Amino acid sequence: MVAMSAKHVTLIVLIALLSPFVPINTKLILEKYVALFNPSREEVRQFFCTTWQKHTDGSLLTPLEMLASQWMELHPEFQAILSDPSGALEQEFTPEKGITNPFLHLSMHLSISEQISIDQPPGIRQIANTLSKKLDSEHEAQHQIMECLGQVLWQAQRDASALDANTYLESLRKLL
């Protein structure tokens, strides 16, 4: 069994809470956990920066850090930010600046990876695998999935409604 710090477990919990497809009863349990160990924006950013530092140093990584570092490796445009923890903690990433928020982007990669690994919503794993083969790139497939997830999240927020798994899956199927 791999030992994980409270911060790593909390990040996993936050990813699960962000996922619209984790069952409600599980989310209620997770929300109680988050109420006790709710990491700040700085702690989440620190997780990614520390993981990147450990990765570049060749240090031993936890399974979550290994997954995160694989996505970081595929995003050289984020690596300078990840290599500067103090700058990363202070920087604001707003649409007006035209800069992608690397921490949101990487968190979405982790969330989508989790959705695929547990096949939630049911069918996403097959869609992701088919799309990866079609595009000959798991990374590009995740970026297209990310666009669909972002759209469904935006619609739910705009309408003050729950996320619609069917709409999400329907938009993913259109990618095929």
Language-model segments: which ranges?
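Heme-based O2/NO sensor domains and their adjacent alpha-helical segments
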Residues: F78-K133
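Short alpha-helical scaffolding segments that buttress acidic/His motifs in well-ordered protein cores
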Residues: F48, A68-M72, S111-I112, A128, ...
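Short hydrophobic alpha-helical segments enriched in small aliphatic residues
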Residues: A6-V9
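Glycine-rich, aromatic-bearing surface loops/beta-hairpins
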Residues: W154-L176
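Core of compact, soluble alpha-helical bundle domains
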Residues: A35-T100
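Methionine residue identity
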Residues: M1-M4
